[in-house]
């Protein structure tokens, strides 16, 4: 890949891209913006669209789909509204995204890249991540974990799970659905009005062979977990960013990533360049959705 400012970004983040668990980031303090007494709604204009940056994929990528957030029920509208008003200082609060998930989030490069891109367009926006190695949605289904999320004061909550649920051969779709439901209900008790964006896992392999001669095959359960996440999103009127399908789906996602040399030797985790690309595309999808909201006003 050609060196760019994004390559420099993940190089700077590389020391923190480790798999060991450390303390959950402390709650960030809200930034203060210039206060405006008038809402832009009063003048019939919300905010201007934001310029989009093109983030090209490696040449070997095939079957890449349109990079969009699916939100047929406009579940994210309250977040777009607040973000638009913060753009013109119609409100004095900062806007915060909290990204919760497994080791893909825990490695920091994925969420920090997304946050860096977004902050360049939205000066009021802060992006906080909370990832745990080996996590599933069940990992966060405790009063303590939810309380920690609440303390971060999210205006939008991103949930990124599915890799670990689907990694074992004992994957059960019904159990996975119940675990998603349990976490969702617990979050809704404490954060009833916070919009939630689900993401799907990027894809992984499962290991076979012997200790001397390892072999890897595409994990066939990833597509089942993805379908389950999409079903849950539809039945609970939640927005979803389908990372798996966007980068090639069952036919090409894993082949695209490995073909570009962007996966680690374990064939589950990604190199910093791979996570950086995922973060860039997540931020691009968020900006597209924001632009669609303000342009429809």
Predicted regions span which residues?
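Catalytic His-Asp segment of secreted/periplasmic serine-dependent ester chemistry enzymes
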Residues: 203-297
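Alpha/beta-hydrolase-fold catalytic nucleophile elbow
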Residues: 160, 199-200
């Amino acid at each position: 890949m050609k060196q760019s400012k994004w390559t420099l970004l993940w190089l700077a983040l590389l020391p923190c891209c480790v798999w060991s668990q450390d303390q959950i980031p402390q709650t960030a303090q809200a930034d203060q913006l210039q206060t405006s007494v008038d809402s832009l709604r009063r003048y019939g204009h919300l905010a201007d669209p934001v310029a989009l940056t093109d983030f090209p994929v490696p040449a070997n990528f095939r079957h890449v789909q349109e990079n969009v957030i699916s939100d047929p029920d406009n579940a994210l509208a309250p977040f777009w509204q607040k973000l638009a008003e913060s753009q013109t200082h119609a409100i004095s609060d900062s806007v915060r995204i909290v990204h919760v998930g497994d080791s893909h989030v825990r490695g920091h490069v994925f969420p920090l890249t997304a946050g860096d891109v977004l902050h360049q367009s939205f000066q009021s926006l802060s992006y906080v991540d909370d990832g745990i190695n080996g996590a599933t949605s069940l990992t966060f289904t405790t009063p303590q974990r939810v309380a920690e999320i609440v303390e971060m004061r999210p205006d939008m909550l991103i949930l990124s799970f599915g890799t670990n649920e689907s990694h074992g051969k004992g994957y059960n779709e019904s159990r996975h659905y119940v675990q998603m439901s349990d976490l969702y209900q617990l979050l809704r008790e404490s954060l009833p009005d916070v919009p939630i964006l689900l993401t799907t896992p990027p894809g992984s392999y499962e290991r076979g062979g012997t200790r001397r001669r390892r072999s890897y095959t595409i994990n066939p359960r990833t597509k089942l977990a993805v379908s389950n996440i999409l079903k849950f999103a539809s039945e609970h009127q939640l927005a979803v960013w389908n990372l798996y399908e966007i980068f090639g789906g069952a036919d090409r996602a894993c082949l695209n990533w490995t073909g570009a040399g962007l996966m680690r030797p374990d064939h589950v985790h990604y190199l910093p360049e791979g996570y950086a690309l995922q973060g860039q595309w997540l931020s691009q999808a968020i900006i597209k959705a924001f632009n669609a909201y303000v342009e429809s006003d």
